[in-house]
Amino acid sequence: MKRLLLAHRLLASALLTLALLLLWHGNAAALDPGCEEGEHLDGAGYLICMPNTWNGELLIYVYGYVSPTAPVEIPPEQLQPGGSAISINQFATDQGYAFAASDYGSNGLSVQTALVHIEDLVTTFTALKGAPSRVLLLGVSEGGLTAALALEQRPDLYAGGLALCGSYGDFAAQTDYMGDVRVLFDYYFPDVIPGSPVAIPQTLVDTWETGFYTDTVRPVITAPENAATVEELLTVAGVAHDAGDTDAQVAALETLLWYNVIGTNDASAKLGGQPFDNQGRVYSGSADDAALNAAVARFTADTAARATIAADYTSSGKLAVPFVTMHTRRDPTVPYAQATIYGEKVAAKSSQLLVDIASREVPFPFPAVSQTVQCVAGQEANVR
């Protein structure tokens, strides 16, 4: 037992070192990663990169949310987030790790397919390169939830992991958070966006990124006379923001509306119904809470959707291997509360295998890709 505890502590230390390297890694020239592409499970594409000198360990990258309308592939922009000078696969091989990633066979809400594909990726890697001494996971955004579930469910396969800004605490709460933003937008700015928060017209999905947002929504939320209303909307929705920073507020609202418009129908189809529920929600922080709560639209989640979330998208906090989470305290897309909730789950299991790193309070304006950039600025580590 003492040896097992020591091994876990050593691995936790290694993961923390990897996290700190992510924090401070500069733009130095990378070693040639020796990458190769191929196909594995059901024709899914993989990327495998080997370092010049392999330390024997494999780092699997579990990327974040991708639009359901995008091509199914390992998203290049998530391998090199924010146009950084070094890619994640180069970073991994610089540290001596073998690197591997796979597409998930689908986009949008892909947690369950991701779990299957990364597991098969280990088999594929082993057949091509030999068995790794340890397999570690690096999950970003939606991939952070996938990594948490994978570590909880397959500690025999994965030795530990690192997750950045994921909804690993309470996926149902994350779903409601996204829905609240759209419900409140429709209250404050009625008849701007067609459809409802739980039923998105396909024409809106098709045109959101090619003109509708830019031509119809953005002029409304950037109008100087609406600045106070936008800030109140974010306050009521519980979106982290800095008072008076209108550019960041608009960017946060743009991102959250993007997820609602682009992702809602896909999520409902995969969950077996629409998952958003605000029947019992009491909104506060507005100029007139009574009027807001009386008039805001109310929705009841489909029972099947919530049951699917509970069964397939909800972490337990039961860890048998070390896990490091990194999360921005001011994250407007996936609130820092997700890290807090997950920490409470782990603590309830009397585990000491979680390290939580809270990053600088720097809000960011973009979806999952930029979460990587912001999360790697983390500073404060708290071990539970």
Write out the residue ranges for each language-model feature.
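Alpha/beta-hydrolase active-site loop
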Residues: 108-129
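Short beta-strand/loop motif that positions the catalytic acidic residue
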Residues: 325-327
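Short beta-strand element of the alpha/beta-hydrolase
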Residues: 56-66
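Conserved alpha/beta-hydrolase "acid-adjacent" motif
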Residues: 333-338
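Accessory cap/linker subdomain of secreted extracellular hydrolases
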Residues: 167-316
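Primarily recognizes the serine-hydrolase "nucleophile elbow" in alpha/beta-hydrolase
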Residues: 133-189
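Histidine-bearing beta->alpha loop at or near hydrolase active sites
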Residues: 354-378
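N-terminal cap/lid segment of alpha/beta-hydrolase-fold proteins
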Residues: 31-54, 291-299
